[in-house]
From Swiss-Prot:
Protein name, entry field: UDP-N-acetylmuramate--L-alanine ligase
InterPro entries documented for this protein: Mur-like_cat_sf, Mur_ligase_C, Mur_ligase_C_dom_sf, Mur_ligase_cen, Mur_ligase_N, MurCDEF_pg_biosynth, UDP-N-AcMur_Ala_ligase_MurC
EC category name: ligase
Species whose genome carries this gene: Streptococcus pyogenes serotype M5 (strain Manfredo)
Residues reported in the UniProt entry to bind ATP: 109-115
Length: 442
């Protein structure tokens, strides 16, 4: 039976994906959010989903309300629902109930969730009818689907309502210092989550913290080293992607190619292969569809403006920065790697300042944008982007949206824009600068 859903905070990456999924399943969907443009809204607009400004008038008694995790009692729509005792569900609670209708495949981990969820979704949907929800704002819903692939987020332990049949865990790392107290707290959260997985876990076997995880379901380890249950080996990394074989219990289960770059993407693919092997999916079909994966939004997304290569990536943690730069060097080994990075949240910048500097030193030159504070925090003046610049050994300087012209001081370069805030504003300024230079030279 068709329902009407109203999403409070519909532009959030998970929320927009869920909205698209429910829309495609035949339900009426609308939502509200701030006016500021966010990259997820294009997909919503293309689907014909109405996006409204926040207003009490948006809510009617016949609707099912789904509320984004960032929106609290100070939001006018949430306050209205509470005042009038209109029931609503948080995103993660709704998802926990929704997945019960499917055989579910979850992807958790500090880094690589979205890319791995995208890869798993791509392969499975090309083999059989599959619904999926990806953290880049992409979702697909089918009422006839047997399988459901989704991203499982550890922040504020939002993954605790989830009880999937299968789950990949890509890694454990200290992040979200505004919530987690340290690496032990992060590990404990993942351990609690792992205990809820029903059939099997697929865990990166070279992560010391992950190896401490215990769960009732079988745990399969994947990685590069002997001793793992699924081992990627005979690896060739080229400018066209990565080729490798995977063996399980001493037997080769397939030879694979992914048109993706960086060691981390080989690991992501190996996790997907391991999960689908245990789930009984034909490895020849898996190999066929791995070859055609085109990536996910804001994860090593490339464009060329007037012969200048620009890469856009969501990387906002030191581990992710290192992985993104590694991928850029694999694809463009003869080019200078110029990193343009915007720190995301003051708490993360303070907690990981030294690690950020070390990671950014992997680039040849570094430009920094002003720190992007989250809606949950206040700038107390405890850290400035200049503090990070001072710790970077490679050539570095701070740029503004209004003046990105220092980026032109490079020949034969690849420009890698990284961040989870509004780094795309800097990217767009640079693109406009390049376009104007071309016009002036004509």
């Amino acid at each position: 039976m068709s329902k009407t859903y109203h999403f409070i905070g519909i532009k959030g990456s998970g929320m927009s994906a869920l909205a698209l999924m429910l829309h495609q399943m035949g339900h009426m969907v609308q939502g509200s959010d701030v006016e500021k443009y966010y990259f997820t809204q294009r997909g919503l607009e293309q689907a014909g989903i109405t996006i409204l400004p926040f207003s009490e008038d948006n809510i009617t008694p016949d609707m099912e309300l789904i509320v984004g995790n960032a929106f609290r009692e100070n939001n006018k729509e949430v306050a209205y629902a509470l005042r009038h005792q209109i029931p609503f569900k948080r995103y993660h609670d709704f998802l926990g109930d929704f997945m019960k209708s499917f055989i579910s495949f979850a992807v958790a981990g500090a880094h690589g969730k979205t890319s791995t969820t995208g890869l798993l979704s791509h392969v499975l949907k090309n083999i059989t009818d599959t619904s999926y929800l990806i953290g880049d704002g992409t979702g697909r819903g089918s009422a006839n689907a047997q399988y459901f692939v989704f991203e499982s987020d550890e922040y504020e332990r939002h993954f605790m309502p989830y009880h999937p049949e299968y789950s990949i865990i890509t890694n454990i790392d200290f992040d979200h210092p505004d919530y987690f107290t340290g690496i032990a707290d992060v590990r404990n959260a993942f351990n609690d989550y792992a205990k809820q997985v029903k059939k099997a876990l697929f865990v990166y076997g070279e992560d010391d913290e992950l190896k401490k995880i215990e769960a009732p379901a079988p745990i399969y380890y994947y990685g590069f080293e002997e001793g793992n249950d699924f081992i990627a080996y005979d690896i060739t990394r080229t400018t066209n992607g990565s080729d490798f074989k995977v063996k399980h219990q001493g037997e080769v289960i397939g030879q694979f190619h992914v048109p993706a770059y960086g060691k981390h993407n080989i690991l992501n693919a190996t996790a997907v292969i391991a999960n689908l092997f245990v789930a009984g999916i034909d490895m020849a079909l898996v190999a066929d569809h791995l070859k055609t994966f085109s990536g996910v939004k804001r994860r090593f997304t490339e464009k060329i403006i007037n012969d200048t290569i620009i890469i856009d990536d969501f990387a906002h943690h030191p581990t992710e920065i290192v992985a993104t730069i590694d991928a850029a060097r694999q694809k463009y080994p003869s080019k200078e790697i110029v990193a343009i990075f915007q720190p995301h949240t003051f708490t993360r910048t303070i907690a990981l300042l030294e690690d950020f500097a070390c990671a950014l030193n992997e680039a040849d030159s570094v430009y920094l944008a002003q720190i992007y504070g989250s809606a949950r925090e206040v700038d107390k003046g405890e850290v400035k982007v200049e503090d990070l610049a001072a710790k970077i050994i490679k050539p570095s300087q701070v740029v503004t949206v209004e003046n990105v012209s220092p980026l032109l001081d490079h020949d034969n370069a690849v420009y890698v824009f990284m961040g989870a805030g509004d780094i795309q504003l800097y990217e767009h300024s640079f693109e406009e600068l390049l376009a104007n230079l071309t016009k002036n030279n004509q």
